[in-house]
């Protein structure tokens, strides 16, 4: 009986043994001397993965995805929680080069342990210039995140040990603190700004998978000084610093057009009675507005909050765009009729009042766009410049 008890205890101890199997990827930024770290381990059942991920706190978010591209892949995206010191981990599905969408088919639970320093926190060491000095770190277990547990064969989940082949991964970080754009949210569906750095790497899934009968855990530091170093993974490749200028161009062109060009065209007609100059200036403005509108549509298609085109900024913008083309049509028809008859027309009256109304709507829509795009700080300088232009217009 004693022998049986000892054997039973031994079996339980074996079943509960903790595996140190893991793969660790580390990317060192030589310019900033900062690191992006991703380490993962797969449970012996193949159902769960345990992860450690960290990146500079100056970035809005950090992410890792399974596969060689964003096409139909599972991504784990982490960002600061609402209080600015904790972390939120959101599993999302990426369908291409657009903002990934949250999926409830994968559930992630944050893991806390005494030997995991600064786990699931944002450390703040102060500021340098416009950047936050510190590290954001997340430790978690994600259920149903592996390839063989994927609910859809089209979605690439995190690989489990099957061979010694290296499995591809992608990683990225969100934009920095310039303009106070850092994300702080408890929501798993929080809106993300486009990455400003991304790349690829490979990891050995077999080395990261716990042996049968053992329990995986969040990968611990693998150096004597309690840091992470590359293990069972290849160095980063195809890295790219990214800076999407499209939103800035869209906003800049629209502001220049509605604050300067359209009012200038109106003043040429009102003060100098220059009909042709008025028409040329307003047509230039319309061309610029059309280009900026097209750019806005492309930008909107990349983000979850804007792809349905139902925000106040987008709806007003589309109405303004249609009204501008109607204004051009009315202006041409009125001018042709007036040249023939010498009499004022109803079209001319509509044209007279529609123009200022559209410009006013454009002025109002700009701050809505700044707020919608996550740049409310731009509202103040915009309003100051706009008021100056209005005062000049009134004084003439």
Describe the residue ranges of each PLM region.
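Extracellular-facing/secreted segment signature in eukaryotic proteins
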Residues: 13-238
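Membrane-embedded alpha-helical bundles that constitute the cytochrome b-like, heme-associated redox core
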Residues: 2-17, 203, 212-396
């Amino acid at each position: 009986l004693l022998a049986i008890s000892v054997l039973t205890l031994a079996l339980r101890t074996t079943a509960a043994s903790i595996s140190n199997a893991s793969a660790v990827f580390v990317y060192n930024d030589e310019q900033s001397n900062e690191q992006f770290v991703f380490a993962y381990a797969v449970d012996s059942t193949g159902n769960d993965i345990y992860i450690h991920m960290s990146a500079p706190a100056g970035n809005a978010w950090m992410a890792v995805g399974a596969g060689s591209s964003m096409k139909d892949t599972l991504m784990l995206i982490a960002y600061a929680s609402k209080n600015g010191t904790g972390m939120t981990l959101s599993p999302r599905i990426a369908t291409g080069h657009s903002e990934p969408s949250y999926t409830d088919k994968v559930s992630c639970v944050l893991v806390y342990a005494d030997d995991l320093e600064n786990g699931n926190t944002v450390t703040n060491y102060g500021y340098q210039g416009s950047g936050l000095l510190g590290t954001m770190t997340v430790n978690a277990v994600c259920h149903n995140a592996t390839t063989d547990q994927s609910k859809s064969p089209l979605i690439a989940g995190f690989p489990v040990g099957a061979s010694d082949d290296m499995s591809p991964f992608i990683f990225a970080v969100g934009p920095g603190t310039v303009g106070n754009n850092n994300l702080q949210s408890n929501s798993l569906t929080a809106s993300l700004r486009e990455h400003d750095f991304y790349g690829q790497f490979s990891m050995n899934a077999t080395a990261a998978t716990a042996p049968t009968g053992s329990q995986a855990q969040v990968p611990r530091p693998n150096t004597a000084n309690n840091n992470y170093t590359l293990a069972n993974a290849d160095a980063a490749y195809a890295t790219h610093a990214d800076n999407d200028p499209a939103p800035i161009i869209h906003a800049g062109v629209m502001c220049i057009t509605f604050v300067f060009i359209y009012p200038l065209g109106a003043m040429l007609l009102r003060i100098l009675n220059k009909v042709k100059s008025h028409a040329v200036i307003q047509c230039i403005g319309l061309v610029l507005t059309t280009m900026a509108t097209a750019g806005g549509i492309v930008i909107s298609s990349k983000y979850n909050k804007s792809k349905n085109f139902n925000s106040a900024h987008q709806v007003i913008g589309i109405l303004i765009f249609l009204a501008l083309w109607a204004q051009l049509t009315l202006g041409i028809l009125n001018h042709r009729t007036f040249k023939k008859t010498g009499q004022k027309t109803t079209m001319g009256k509509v044209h007279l009042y529609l123009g200022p109304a559209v410009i006013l709507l454009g002025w109002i829509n700009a701050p809505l766009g700044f707020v919608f795009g996550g740049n409310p700080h731009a509202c103040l300088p915009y309003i100051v410049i706009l008021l100056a232009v209005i005062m000049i217009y009134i004084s003439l």
